[in-house]
Amino acid sequence: MIETFNTGETQESLRQEYNPDGSVLRKAQLRLLDMAIYLQETAKKIGVPCRLDGGNVLGAMRHGGFIPWDDDIDMVVDYKDFKRLCDYLKAHPHPQYVLQDNDTDPGFYKEWACLRDLKSENRSHDNQQSADRRMHEAQKFRGLHVDIFPYEGNMIPWLQRLAAKLSVNVNLKLAGRYPLLAQIAYKFLHVIVFPVFRLVGKLFGNPDLYMHSYGAWFYEQNPRRCMIPHKDIVFEGHTFEGPADADELCRIAYGNYMDLPPRDKRDRHKIDVVFK
C-alpha cells in the first residue's frame, strides 16, 4: 500500500472524496466486509479454501482494503468445492444473509452464486427499460451481495468466451421478460452444455491454465502458480485468504496496478443502496 499516487492524490484524499466515514458507500463497504468475514469463516469451518478475487485483491495491494469508489466483494472457490459450500450455506442459513442461486431465487440465472444481505436493497437507476435493470428486478433477493465464483484449471479460453456469451444472453435478453424460457435456457446450459465444455477441457485443456468456470462473465487467464495455494492477504484490517501471488495476478489483470486510473475510468456501479 502506498500513500501518494501517480495523480498526486493520497489515501486520505481518496477516502474523503469517495467513501468518507458515515457515507452510504462506506456503510455498504462495511456491511460487505462483515459478509465476507462470515463467508470465509464458514468456508474454513467446512474445509473449503475461499479467497478474495479481482478488484478486492487490487484494493488490498493498493489501498489496504476497498478501492475507495468500489461497492462489491468477489470471492472464489475451486469448482470442485463450489457446490459443497453453497449447499452448506443453504442448509445452515444466517439470520441476515442468504445464499442466492437458481434454487433459492428462480429469477437468478447465473453460473455463480451470491451471498445476499436481507437488510439492504440495491436500487438500479438504469433506464427502466434497460436489460440490466430488468435482470436486476427479476431477482427475488436484491440486497448488497458478495459474489462467489467457481474457478478451475483445464480451461479452454474460446469455449469460456462462448459460454459467457450464452449465459449473458439468457440474463440480458430473457430475464424479466420471458421467465419460463429463461429457466429452460439456464437449465439447458447448466446441466448439458457447460458440463460438455468441461469434459472437452479435461481432454484437451491446459491443466495449468486457470479461469473462472464456464458461464462466468470473465475471461482472465491465470497460471496455476499465481492462483494456488492460497496465501493470506490483509483487507480492511482483517486477514483473508488471497491468491498465491497477488502481485502477478494483479499485473496480469491490471498492468501497472499501483497507478490510479483517470477519474473518468473509475467505474462506479449504477446502484443506490437503501438500508432497511
Where do the protein language model's features map onto the residues?
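A short secondary-structure junction signal
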Residues: 157-164
